[in-house]
Regions:
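Charge-patterned, long linear interaction tracts outside catalytic cores
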Residues: 278-287
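HKD-type phospholipase D/PLD-like phosphodiesterase module
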Residues: 1-21, 27-168, 195-269, 276
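Class I S-adenosylmethionine-dependent transferase superfamily signal
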Residues: 40, 187-190
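Long, repeat-rich segments with strong aromatic
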Residues: 177-179, 184-188
Length: 287
């Protein structure tokens, strides 16, 4: 199942939590949304064993209030110490129970579900759930993960090659991303693909990324800016003819090689078409 925000709102997240029966693991960069916290609280009252793990120092944020509110739900709570270093983050956005997983682009805050373009994907694939469970348990316990990663998952550190394979797939690709950044392998792949690439970024993109845009435009990459008053592009997606990517990864060196990030590769034609249609609608609203 694929959900598109802000259209879908917070309901899919709350429904996922409400459907949990025995356990629920949540790993998200930032969590402050009241309906989600309330759903967690009710899940614990039903007897669900809830574990929540967040980043300890989201960029330019103090999270003392957020930590206090999470603890008040009664959930088991940890800061991800495996990625608690300078300029390194637990930037993942996923949750799972014993039979379903949700992977997406949204932080769990009000803006994600009311103002942002975000994508959330749910799966019942047992192998994906098993991989995510092992990753979560390692990070939650503060132990380096060295296990098997399902081939459909895109997990950082070490996600560069899978993102390059998304860019290099035959045919045109459509990208929505909050930022670009100077990471030579990614920029070279985009430049090489040239006019077969369309990219949507928010109009508030940094001056540094504006330089990256000018570089890519020299290679005929098509780039448009989405006005923030329309919708804020926080999504991280690559959509091609054969497969699509949704995840927490920005296309920067740190995101792909240092952070904890989680994404998913989708091969379902119906969902790929849904993503393409949304991209085309967004493209038409850009400038």
């Amino acid at each position: 199942m694929l959900y598109i925000m802000p259209n879908a709102g917070v309901i899919p997240i709350v429904r996922f939590i409400n459907n949990a029966k025995r356990d629920l693991d949540v790993n998200v960069y930032y969590l402050s949304d009241k309906p989600i916290l309330n759903a967690v609280r009710y899940a614990i009252k039903r007897g669900v064993d809830v574990k929540i793990m967040i980043d300890g120092k989201p960029y330019r944020m103090s999270i003392r209030k957020e930590k206090r509110e999470i603890k008040r739900t009664g959930a088991h709570f940890e800061i991800d110490k495996m990625f608690d270093r300078k300029y390194v983050f637990d930037h993942a956005k996923y949750m799972l129970d014993n039979h379903e997983a949700l992977i997406g682009t949204a932080n769990f805050d009000w803006s994600a579900f009311h103002k942002n373009r975000e994508y959330e994907y749910t799966t019942y694939n047992k192998n994906i759930i098993s991989s995510l469970k092992n990753i979560f348990n390692s990070d939650y316990s503060g132990v380096k993960f060295n296990g098997h990663i399902n081939h459909n998952l895109v997990v950082s550190p070490g996600a560069t090659q899978k993102i390059l394979s998304m860019i290099d797939q035959p045919g045109s690709i459509d990208i929505e991303t909050e930022e670009l950044g100077y990471y030579r392998p990614i920029l070279s792949a985009l430049a090489k693909k040239g006019s077969a690439v369309k990219i949507i970024v928010p109009s508030s993109i940094s001056n540094y990324d504006k330089k990256i845009i000018r570089f890519l435009e020299k290679y005929r990459v098509k780039i448009r800016l989405m006005p923030a008053r329309t919708v804020y592009i926080h999504a991280k997606t690559i959509v091609g003819r054969q497969k699509a990517f949704i995840g927490s990864e920005n296309f920067t060196y740190t995101s792909l090689n240092k952070n904890r990030e989680v994404g998913i590769i989708i091969y379902n034609d119906q969902l790929i078409n849904k993503l393409k249609n949304q991209f085309n609608n967004d493209w038409a609203r850009c400038r």
